[in-house]
């Protein structure tokens, strides 16, 4: 859509609204494209010379392989033949360089999907492969940025070949070359290649690190070259600085090589060098680096050095749950067996644990604990895994010290990063059985706090990753411990997980909590009503936040174990949340939960909220006012349903507290400024809910105060921010409607004449304000007035609104006020009803229907534009909607008030708008057009060419026709050119579309389907 033709204002949407989460996944059963891939690989020899064809075939292969990123195991049966086809090209000495590199590119794409560790095993590793692969690597240019896939795959291939069980010296033969010069031994050639590629900046560096880890651990290489290689890496580390790009690249390669080496090397081989490497690593001070990858590699190396220092043995003291079968876990007999196994394991002699722990371990553990507080997740995650691995090799006392140090991460003086890292580490310990049952009582409070950790920091919040980690910790506990160990904490953990699954702000946390709850239900079998809750709050159900708050929560609260914890969480943690959307959802959830615990709401929650509603904290005050409104309304509805007094659940103190909210805020001038943008709609909502609750405040002075607030809010709209205006306006209008219906009507169903005259006159006078927003507010306010307030003043109100819809030089850009005036006219018509022979001061009748239609039809031609674009589109859209509402109202009551001329004008203008170039307005016009055409209870009279229209737009296609698609809409619209009544208007609309900047409408709009003489008949 062209810039000049966009919907200038669009719809006003809340920026903080949670984005819709759509989970789309490909659940595949096999590698269905195997034949297509075979054909692609077979065509490489024919297309490599054409760059365009080469790019096409590569992109096709990438698209196919990317489908299997989440299910790469489906490729396993096909990897061998794919590799063989590509290796045939690579081994062919006649393959041109372009084809050679293209084959390696395809190998890399496969490796990227399946992972190099598995793909590595498939490489041929015969003795005869060593020399050719070495020669191919030597022929490569390490600086060629176009062929990095070739170098990466060759190094991986070499890392597999170098595992051949023969002394490399046998490959050297005659060490003298033909020219008489000494030739470099094969061992040194491979090492030089590895060293060369450890200092490059591309992907080959990763493969070089893998090569080093496989090559250096060979017995012959270890004896002759390991010490020298480690000296070289430590020297390179010492000379490099992470403050330069070159130094960062070098350090990355060295750290990868060392980490891989200490992972794959034997402990007895690496132990003599571990202390030296650790000392060098300390001197590098990687914790001060801004490079996340360097800090992560440093953490990985530190933990592997720590594992080298301690013996590779499983701790005898670790907690062993025993049977892992889900079915057995739920059987009482199995539980007894497991308890016996645990007792035996706990009583085993610990004679093997008496060994000295090197002093370096303290340094290693300290660095890992510091790593848990790193600012980046991948560093914390690496540190957490290191803590788990090393703790499993420590004696029981030292391991308990590590757990104690971990628990220090969970003080509120620590950052959210420390909490997150601590949760990950505790989960690792629990998963490995290293967190003994004696520590569960210390860890459970941490879980409960972490599951609700949410803090605002600047313009965003922190804590979502922490809550996610807490769910992982709960999941790990479910798998690690016998149900009997967690029995004392079951209610706390289950309630916390339910609350996180239903009320968390972030969808990933809700889903993580749901998964953790499911794991606990399956593994523990002790969560109250676990299966029932899982059915309602499964992984997919919790994806929709509104559904969680308003529907799922009500179902779960039906189980008494969860009712009060859920209510308390909303009151304590959510109504004061930094996100206004969460606050509003929480108050609506409280409304829905009130029938589950009405006495608790009335006697505990409401008295707790009333002081908060006039407190000092803005967010708490906002949420508390809304919560008071929703809970009060719910209690009154419940009392009414049970045939009790409206005030059954309220005492005098509560009623007085509700009345005092507005007076207190007004006296403290809290309606001013940015805070007022929250307070005004909140108190208006309170007014609306108290009015709907029929509170006994009739004649009370508070009613005047509420009316003042509504009027002042509408007058203050120009001062509100753009984001808040709509909400303030809607809240005030809704409050006005409810207030009038409850407190301004007497026993005879009429209004006090003085009050009516003052209110209506005041609102009509505001319609001529020089501020557009004031016109908008009071237009909608007039539209919201009940029938008894409009009685005797209808013509005056309609005339005032008609003037707002007129375009004058002074207010040509007041599109929003014209839109809202049209909306108000339609609302008023529906409020007062239709009576053909009635008074024009009370009903829509024959005396004023023509004037109403004239006002609405006049606005269908509003094409005002300004810097925001086609703002007149808002007016046209509102006019079309109002025309539809008024017409259907008349048709259903007194259809004779609609004459043929009016109906023709309506349908013709709608037909013109259906040829609109802006998709949104075209779709709306088309929808209104078809609604009037196919309405049949009773049908709209006097529609020109009804039979032809029903043939062009069959009733069966009314809902499926996509008006947003120009290619679908215009072929239908152009057929109206054959109908004389519509020709001029449709051609006018098509002309605008053809001349517009939008390519699709310009192409689709020409009347190709209208017949050869359609245009001629017009003239």
Curated annotation (Swiss-Prot):
GO terms for molecular function: beta-tubulin binding; GTPase activator activity. Residues 1-20 are annotated as: Disordered. It is found in: Cell junction, Tight junction; Lateral cell membrane; Cytoplasm; Cell junction, Adherens junction. One of its GO terms (cellular component) is adherens junction. Keywords: Cell junction, Cell membrane, Chaperone, Cytoplasm, Cytoskeleton, Membrane, Repeat, Tight junction. It comes from the Eukaryota. Its main location: other. InterPro entries: ARM-like, ARM-type_fold, TBCD, Tubulin_specific_chaperoneD_C. GO terms for biological process: adherens junction assembly; bicellular tight junction assembly; microtubule cytoskeleton organization; negative regulation of cell-substrate adhesion; negative regulation of microtubule polymerization; post-chaperonin tubulin folding pathway; protein folding; tubulin complex assembly. HEAT repeats lie at residues 364-402, 856-898. Belongs to the TBCD family. Found in a complex with at least ARL2, PPP2CB, PPP2R1A, PPP2R2A, PPP2R5E and TBCD. Interacts with PPP2CB. Part of a supercomplex made of cofactors A to E. Cofactors A and D function by capturing and stabilizing tubulin in a quasi-native conformation. Cofactor E binds to the cofactor D-tubulin complex; interaction with cofactor C then causes the release of tubulin polypeptides that are committed to the native state. Interacts with ARL2; interaction is enhanced with the GDP-bound form of ARL2. Does not interact with ARL3, ARL4A and ARL4D. Interacts with beta tubulin. Interacts with TBCE. Tubulin-folding protein implicated in the first step of the tubulin folding pathway and required for tubulin complex assembly. Involved in the regulation of microtubule polymerization or depolymerization, it modulates microtubule dynamics by capturing GTP-bound beta-tubulin (TUBB). Its ability to interact with beta tubulin is regulated via its interaction with ARL2. Acts as a GTPase-activating protein (GAP) for ARL2. Induces microtubule disruption in absence of ARL2. Increases degradation of beta tubulin, when overexpressed in polarized cells. This is Tubulin-specific chaperone D.
């Amino acid at each position: 859509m062209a810039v000049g033709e966009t919907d200038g204002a669009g719809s006003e949407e809340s920026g903080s609204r949670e984005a819709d989460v759509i989970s789309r996944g490909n659940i595949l059963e096999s590698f269905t494209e195997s034949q297509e891939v075979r054909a692609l690989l077979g065509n490489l020899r024919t297309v490599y010379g054409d760059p365009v064809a080469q790019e096409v075939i590569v992109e096709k292969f990438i698209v196919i392989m990317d489908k299997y990123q989440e299910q790469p195991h489906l490729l396993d049966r096909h990897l061998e033949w794919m590799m063989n086809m590509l290796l045939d090209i690579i081994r062919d000495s006649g393959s041109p360089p372009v084809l050679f590199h293209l084959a390696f590119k395809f190998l890399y794409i496969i490796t990227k999907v399946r992972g190099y560790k598995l793909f590595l095993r498939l490489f041929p590793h015969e003795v005869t492969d060593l020399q050719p692969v070495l020669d191919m690597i030597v022929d490569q240019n390490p600086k060629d940025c176009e062929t990095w896939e070739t170098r990466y795959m060759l190094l991986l291939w070499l890392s597999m070949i170098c595992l051949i069980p023969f002394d490399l010296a046998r490959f050297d033969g005659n060490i003298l070359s033909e020219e008489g010069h000494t030739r470099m031994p094969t061992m040194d050639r491979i090492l030089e290649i590895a060293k060369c590629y450890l200092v490059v900046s591309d992907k080959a560096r990763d493969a070089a690190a893998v090569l080093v880890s496989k090559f250096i651990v060979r017995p012959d290489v270890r004896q002759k070259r390991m010490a020298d290689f480690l000296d070289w890496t430590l020297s390179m580390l010492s000379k490099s600085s992470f403050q330069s790009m070159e130094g960062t690249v070098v350090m990355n390669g060295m750290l990868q090589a060392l980490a891989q080496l200490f992972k794959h090397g034997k402990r007895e081989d690496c132990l003599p060098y571990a202390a030296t490497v650790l000392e060098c690593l300390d001197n590098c001070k990687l914790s001060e680096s801004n490079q996340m990858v360097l800090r992560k590699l440093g953490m990985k190396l530190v933990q592997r050095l720590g594992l080298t220092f301690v013996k590779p043995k499983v701790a005898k003291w670790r907690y062993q749950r025993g049977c892992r079968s889900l079915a057995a876990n739920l059987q009482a007999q199995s539980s007894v067996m497991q308890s016996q196994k645990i007792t035996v394991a706990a009583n085993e002699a610990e004679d093997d644990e008496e060994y000295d722990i090197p002093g370096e371990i303290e340094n290693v553990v300290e660095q890992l604990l510091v790593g848990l507080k790193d600012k980046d997740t991948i560093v914390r995650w690496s540190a957490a895994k290191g803590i788990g691995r090393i703790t499993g090799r420590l004696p029981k006392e030292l391991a308990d010290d590590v757990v104690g140090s971990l628990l220090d991460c969970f003080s509120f003086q620590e950052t959210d990063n420390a909490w997150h890292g601590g949760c990950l580490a505790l989960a690792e310990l629990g998963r490995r059985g290293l967190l003994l049952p004696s520590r569960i009582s210390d860890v459970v409070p941490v879980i409960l706090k972490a599951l609700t950790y949410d803090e605002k920091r600047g313009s965003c919040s922190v804590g979502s990753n922490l809550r996610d980690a807490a769910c992982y910790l709960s999941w790990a506990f479910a798998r690690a411990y016998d149900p009997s160990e967690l029995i004392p904490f079951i209610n706390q953990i289950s309630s916390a997980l339910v609350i996180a699954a239903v009320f968390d702000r972030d969808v990933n946390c809700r889903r993580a909590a749901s998964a953790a709850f499911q794991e606990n239900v399956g593994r523990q079998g002790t969560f109250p009503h676990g299966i029932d809750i899982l059915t309602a709050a499964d992984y997919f159900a919790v994806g929709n936040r509104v559904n969680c708050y308003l529907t799922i929560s009500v179902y779960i609260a039906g189980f008494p174990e969860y009712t009060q914890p859920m209510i308390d969480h909303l009151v304590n943690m959510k109504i004061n949340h930094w996100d206004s959307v969460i606050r509003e959802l929480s108050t609506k959830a409280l409304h829905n939960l009130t029938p589950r615990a009405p006495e608790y709401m009335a006697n505990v929650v409401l008295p707790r909220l009333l002081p908060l509603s006039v407190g000092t904290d803005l967010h708490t005050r906002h949420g508390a006012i809304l919560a008071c409104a929703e809970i009060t309304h719910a209690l009154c509805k419940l009392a009414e349903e049970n045939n009790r007094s409206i005030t059954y659940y309220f005492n005098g103190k509560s009623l007085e507290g509700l009345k005092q909210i507005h007076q207190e805020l007004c006296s403290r001038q809290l309606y001013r400024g940015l805070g007022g943008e929250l307070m005004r709609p909140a108190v208006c909502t309170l007014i609306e809910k108290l009015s709907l609750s029929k509170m006994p405040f009739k004649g009370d002075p508070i009613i005047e105060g509420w009316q003042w607030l509504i009027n002042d809010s509408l007058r203050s709209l120009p001062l509100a921010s753009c984001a808040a205006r709509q909400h303030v306006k809607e809240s005030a209008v809704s409050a006005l409607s409810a207030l009038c219906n409850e407190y301004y009507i007497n026993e005879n169903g009429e209004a006090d004449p003085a009050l009516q005259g003052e209110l209506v006159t005041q609102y009509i006078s505001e319609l001529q304000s020089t501020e557009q927003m004031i016109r908008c507010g009071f237009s909608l306010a007039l539209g919201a007035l009940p029938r008894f307030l409009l009685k005797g003043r209808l013509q005056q109100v309609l005339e005032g609104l008609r003037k707002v819809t007129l375009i004058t030089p002074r207010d040509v850009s007041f599109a929003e006020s014209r839109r809202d005036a049209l909306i108000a006219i339609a609302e008023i018509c529906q409020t007062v009803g239709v009576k053909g022979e009635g008074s024009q001061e009370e009903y829509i009748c024959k005396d004023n229907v023509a004037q109403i239609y004239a006002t609405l039809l006049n606005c269908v031609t509003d094409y005002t534009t300004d810097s925001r674009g086609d703002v007149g589109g808002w007016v046209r859209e509102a006019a079309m909607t109002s025309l539809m509402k008024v017409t259907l109202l008349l048709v259903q009551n007194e259809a004779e008030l609609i004459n043929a001329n009016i109906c023709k004008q309506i349908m013709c203008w709608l037909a013109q708008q259906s040829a609109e170039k802006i998709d949104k307005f075209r779709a709306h016009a088309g929808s209104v057009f078809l609604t009037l055409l196919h309405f049949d209870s009773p049908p709209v009279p006097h529609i020109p060419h009804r039979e032809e229209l029903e043939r062009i737009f069959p009733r069966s296609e009314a809902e499926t026709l996509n008006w947003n698609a120009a290619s679908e809409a215009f072929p239908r619209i152009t057929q109206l050119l054959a109908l004389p009544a519509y020709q001029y208007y449709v051609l006018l609309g098509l002309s605008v579309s053809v001349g517009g900047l939008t390519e699709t409408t310009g192409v689709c709009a020409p009347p190709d389907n209208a017949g050869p003489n359609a245009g001629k008949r017009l003239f």
